[in-house]
Structure formats: structure tokens, C-alpha cells
Design a protein with these regions (language model features):
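Catalytic pocket of metal/acid-base enzymes, prominently hydrolases
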Residues: 1-2, 7, 18-25, 51-157, ...
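Polyanionic/metal-chelating signatures
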Residues: 13-52, 71-72, 81-95, 104, ...
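Acidic-and-aromatic substrate-binding clefts and catalytic sites of carbohydrate-active enzymes
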Residues: 160-168, 192-199
Length: 306
């Protein structure tokens, strides 16, 4: 647990009206706010050690192992507002390193970060802001991952798909040649391979380069080998966060029916949505070729009303 930089090893982290669990999990994991608030209220721990201890009182089926979630680590040290508005100062960086060091000694798997561009916060006034891990610099990650590297643990992340060169630069953190010791790195993402048929070659090429004798890395890409089925209620789905128009729609409160109707009947919004939706489907690229020949762009299964 603790993937995509999100987790609960610091408890609810509620301070001064802030709800980090609700703010971070709602839109990324598609969980209703009322459910998350009940979960936060039930948390009796506020540190990584007590989080592990609480499992002793649960009737568990599978084994549980946890990453330290980077977004929650930033919030724990800097506070929610600061974690999405500025870089940490030296004392804050040292505090994050100290907490991470303690977690590694407790047996945590490593550090989890996130680079997907459609992971947004859900509470006002931050609905246009992404989760805290995405505001971290290369320097911050290098310092935190040096702790993970020292303990021979794992860096779990999702690729920075907006900028391939930046993603490649960040993935060099796996290199033992550049940073003294190889860092086990797991990069995970769900993709439609039919929409990007050459992506597997790109991933394998990057891994081959970084894991070569020249750079001595330990990078492994993970992808689901089957259909990725997502259940959602209408437009409310993390997958629709990719478009700025639908992200604006999802940012409204779930039960704000009137607000959604106003937005969907706004001519400017309608035009923007149509432009974004048709992008890549009306030209001479692969997506357009696929659509013209009737190949599925995506599969929507509607549950019959009971």
C-alpha cells in the first residue's frame, strides 16, 4: 500500500480545517468524500510506527507491506498549503530525510512518488492544483531517494508523461554509476497499448539504457497485461482528468448538480470540450486511422438498471 505517493501512515493529518486524506484521495482514487471522512475519523495513529502496529488488531488475509507516500510526507512536514506552493527549506528537507530514515528502519518498502498529470486535489481553493509530490524538485527527490538507496529499498513511481526528456532525467536516479549505488525503481502506469503501439519499445529501450553497464541502474516498468476496467459514476473518473474541460467539471462538488449543468451548457466550455475530445481523432495520425476503421478506442460497459 502507499502507491502513487498517497497513503495513511501519518494518520488523518487534519489541521486547521485541512483534510489531506480527502483532498488527495478523492479525485486520484475516485473515492467519495463522505467515505474518506469516515476513514479519517477511524484513524487512531499519527506516525509510521503506530500505523504498522494497528495492523496487528486486524483480521488480515493478504500480507501487508507499505511505501512511505511522498505527498503525505510533504504535507506532514510542510503543511498542505506550503507543500503545493513552495520548495522545502533545508530544515524541512532534513526532517523529511529523518522521517524516511525511521520508516526504512521499521521495514517500509521504500518511497512512492507520482508524475501523472491528471492527479488533482479535490477541496477548495486547491482544485486546480496537483498532489504535493508533483511540486518536488530533482534535488529533493535525489536527497530523499539517497535514504532509500542506502537501505536497498524501492522507489515506486509513475512516469512524467508530459515531458519525456524530464522523465528520462528523473529516471537516471536509478543509476549506480551516477549516484554510487543502484536504486531499485518500479515505474507503473495503465496504458492502452493500441493507442500507443510503439510505447513498449520506448519503455524497453529506456530500461535497457539505464540498466546497462554504462549506467548500472535497476529500472523496471510495470503494465497490466489485461483490460483495465474502471468503474465510475458518469463523468467522475480519474481518466477524464486528462482533459482540462472535464477536469474543471470533476472539480465541482459531487452533488453540485446545478453547477455541473451550468458548466455543460456554457458555449465556451462546450467548444473547449469538443476541441479536446476531437484532438487526435480527426487528422491523419494513428488514432484517426484506427477510428475510421472501426477499431475500438475504448470499451464502455453499462450495467443494466435493476
Amino acid at each position: 500500500v502507499g502507491n502513487c505517493s498517497l497513503g495513511t501512515c501519518f494518520g488523518s493529518q487534519e489541521t486547521e480545517g485541512q483534510e489531506p486524506i480527502v483532498d488527495c484521495f478523492t479525485r486520484v482514487e475516485n473515492i467519495p468524500k463522505k467515505v474518506l471522512r469516515k476513514c479519517a475519523e477511524a484513524m487512531t495513529w499519527d506516525n509510521p510506527e503506530d500505523y504498522l502496529k494497528h495492523f496487528e488488531n486486524l483480521n488480515l488475509g493478504p500480507n501487508i507491506a507499505a511505501f512511505v507516500p511522498h505527498s503525505m510526507l510533504r504535507i506532514e512536514v510542510m503543511g498542505l498549503d506550503a507543500s503545493i506552493s513552495r520548495a522545502p527549506n533545508e530544515l524541512e528537507l532534513q526532517k523529511m530525510e529523518q522521517i524516511l530514515e525511521g520508516a526504512m528502519e521499521l521495514g517500509y518498502l521504500g518511497l512512492s512518488t507520482d508524475g501523472l498529470p491528471f492527479h488533482y486535489l479535490s477541496n477548495d481553493p486547491h482544485t486546480d492544483k496537483r498532489i504535493p509530490t508533483q511540486f518536488a524538485s530533482f534535488k529533493e527527490l535525489r536527497r530523499l531517494l539517497s535514504v532509500v538507496r542506502k537501505h536497498d529499498r524501492v522507489w515506486q513511481t509513475t512516469p512524467i508523461i508530459e515531458n519525456r526528456l524530464k522523465a528520462l532525467f528523473y529516471f537516471t536516479l536509478t543509476s549506480g554509476r551516477l549516484f554510487g549505488k543502484p536504486l531499485k525503481t518500479s515505474a507503473l502506469s495503465a496504458m492502452e497499448m493500441t493507442a500507443a503501439p510503439n510505447s513498449s519499445k520506448l519503455f524497453l529501450g529506456v530500461a535497457k539504457l539505464l540498466n546497462s553497464k554504462l549506467l548500472d541502474g535497476r529500472l523496471h516498468f510495470q503494465a497490466l497485461g489485461t483490460n483495465f476496467r474502471v468503474w465510475s459514476d458518469g463523468i467522475v473518473s480519474p481518466l477524464f482528468e486528462e482533459l482540462s474541460s472535464t477536469a474543471e467539471l470533476i472539480a465541482l462538488e459531487y452533488d453540485d448538480y446545478e453547477g455541473r449543468q451550468r458548466l455543460m451548457h456554457d458555449p465556451e466550455w462546450v467548444e473547449r470540450f469538443r476541441k479536446e475530445w476531437r484532438h487526435g481523432r480527426t487528422g491523419d495520425d494513428f488514432a484517426s486511422w484506427k477510428a475510421k476503421r472501426g477499431l475500438p478506442d475504448s470499451l464502455v460497459i453499462r450495467e443494466p438498471e435493476k
